[in-house]
Amino acid sequence: MIWTLAPFVALLPLVTAQQVGTTADAHPRLTTYKCTSQNGCTRQNTSVVLDAATHFIHKKGTQTSCTNSNGLDTAICPDKQTCADNCVVDGITDYASYGVQTKNDTLTLQQYLQTGNATKSLSPRVYLLAEDGENYSMLKLLNQEFTFDVDASTLVCGMNGALYLSEMEASGGKSSLNQAGAKYGTGYCDAQCYTTPWINGEGNTESVGSCCQEMDIWEANARATGLTPHPCNTTGLYECSGSGCGDSGVCDKAGCGFNPYGLGAKDYYGYGLKVNTNETFTVVTQFLTNDNTTSGQLSEIRRLYIQNGQVIQNAAVTSGGKTVDSITKDFCSGEGSAFNRLGGLEEMGHALGRGMVLALSIWNDAGSFMQWLDGGSAGPCNATEGNPALIEKLYPDTHVKFSKIRWGDIGSTYRH
């Protein structure tokens, strides 16, 4: 996922529970399903939490934020310990005001909130919590499939409704310096290695980057879509510095992506096309191993769609002189690519085997208008229609709906 503005990860508190503040987080319920070939799909009483940086993190006993336009307020946070002593995180009680709504097994994410004549940009990002509400749900997807329904019909050019996996810690990095943990959305990381004010819930007083493996199952709007693994040659959250955070560093920032339009299938995905984004459809992603076991080596990432009861095979495209319809070692074999230098599918598979956290978000891109996803050779959108100012003016109701999120044995999550 290529963010142009770093999403902030928050700190939180030290030894006493008071450091978490007096307002508990609401954690909207979102039913998900775990599936097996033998027993079908079982309901899970899971919930979501907004990223910690969305929460108000302030100096204890005051309304003074622990961050400013330059990052951490160094008067409050001169070092990690003092930062943890000083800063408190407040829970969020009204998720709708942050663009997040759930109903049974459906999650709706809104980009904008309209109040009277005013429009506020929100860009919410949430993580899936386990049934205990204290830890993230850890998805182990080797030789498994992940499936969801999506309504992307209002996601115009320049928007990105994303569903992806991050190798965060189950606890959100909970520690003596971070008593908030996953319950308050701490611990975010991805393959872009951004330098954020907080890392694993602790003040980033040394200005390091936060890296981890990232599996972009779904980055899309109504006009284009991408499926992209981003391996790193590290395990879990890794704090980078200098060149280790850059394009030649520990993570593959670009990834090895499968975008049907970008690979030549220009009539496959979009309004009124084979996968018709005017309507809701189902997305199935399979993580196949070399020996068809959950302990094998990741060898292929396959994609299927289902719409109006019909299974739609992934677009068959030409790459490297061959017809391909999935992500394999051969597909990603570009000479000198960071993907292969950093371990490729095998390394990505290690993270999928250890367990990854599900993140869901909506955002737009003031830096490049999301052209890397849907413009130029990647999609049909022109150079300016993804401008967030234009989207806000013309499409203030842009949103994404994810529903019926389920995962389990290959072939167990859909009818075929």
Swiss-Prot record:
Subcellular location(s): the record lists:
Secreted
Question: From which source organism is this entry?
Answer: Aspergillus oryzae (strain ATCC 42149 / RIB 40) (Yellow koji mold)
Sorted keywords for this record are: Carbohydrate metabolism, Cellulose degradation, Glycoprotein, Glycosidase, Hydrolase, Polysaccharide degradation, Secreted, Signal
Q: What is its EC number?
A: 3.2.1.4
Q: Which Pfam families does the entry link to?
A: Glyco_hydro_7
Residues carrying sugar: N45, N104, N117, N135, N233, N278, N292, N382
Q: Span of the secretion signal?
A: 1-17
Show the catalytic activity.
Answer: Endohydrolysis of (1->4)-beta-D-glucosidic linkages in cellulose, lichenin and cereal beta-D-glucans
Q: Which GO terms describe its molecular function?
A: cellulase activity
Q: What is this protein called?
A: Endo-beta-1,4-glucanase celB
In terms of pH, how does activity behave?
Answer: Optimum pH is 4.0. Stable between pH 3.0 and 7.0.
Q: Determine if Hydrolase is one of this entry's keywords.
A: yes
